[in-house]
C-alpha cells in the first residue's frame, strides 16, 4: 500500500503558503526528473493563486530543500564570475530551479538586471547585466 501522511498547510510569508507532503512513499510524488512535482506544483499554484491570490511553496520529502541547496552550490562560481566581469548567465535551468536561481541572483545583485531568457531550443536561463545596456 501507498503510505502518505495528510499534507500540512501553513503560512510561509505574507504572500506564500507552504504545502508539505511527507510519509514513507512521499518521494513517489516527485517522479522521475521531478515531473510529478512540477505538475503538482503547477496545479496547486494555478488553483490557489487564482482563488486566494497567494503563491505556494511545495515541499515533498525535502525535494525543494535539496533543490535549493544544489542551486546555491551551483551559483557560487556563477556569482563570482558576475562580480568579476559585471555580467553573466546561468546554464539552462528547469522548473523550480529557475525560480530558486532567479530569487538568489536578484538578492545577490539588486542593482543589476536579472531576468529569464529563452534559448533556441526553448530552454530557459538567467542573464545578469547592467540595467542601462541593451540586454543581449
Predicted regions located by residue number:
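RNA-contacting regions in translation and RNA-metabolism proteins
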Residues: 1-136
